């Protein structure tokens, strides 16, 4: 149970970081 929870949390964190980096690159390109 703990392994699944930590894996889900890690996946969510990775997705969030990827989204933030993608949005940041998009803003830089637009500017």
Curated annotation (Swiss-Prot):
It comes from the Eukaryota. Pfam families: PetL. Keywords: Chloroplast, Electron transport, Membrane, Photosynthesis, Plastid, Thylakoid, Transmembrane, Transmembrane helix, Transport. One of its GO terms (biological process) is photosynthesis. Signal peptide: none annotated. InterPro entries: Cyt_b6/f_cplx_su6 (IPR007802). It is found in: Plastid, Chloroplast thylakoid membrane. It is a single-pass membrane protein. GO terms for molecular function: electron transporter, transferring electrons within cytochrome b6/f complex of photosystem II activity. One of its GO terms (cellular component) is cytochrome b6f complex. Component of the cytochrome b6-f complex, which mediates electron transfer between photosystem II (PSII) and photosystem I (PSI), cyclic electron flow around PSI, and state transitions. PetL is important for photoautotrophic growth as well as for electron transfer efficiency and stability of the cytochrome b6-f complex. The 4 large subunits of the cytochrome b6-f complex are cytochrome b6, subunit IV (17 kDa polypeptide, PetD), cytochrome f and the Rieske protein, while the 4 small subunits are PetG, PetL, PetM and PetN. The complex functions as a dimer. PANTHER family: CYTOCHROME B6-F COMPLEX SUBUNIT 6 (PTHR37266:SF1). Belongs to the PetL family. This is Cytochrome b6-f complex subunit 6. It comes from Arabidopsis thaliana (Mouse-ear cress).
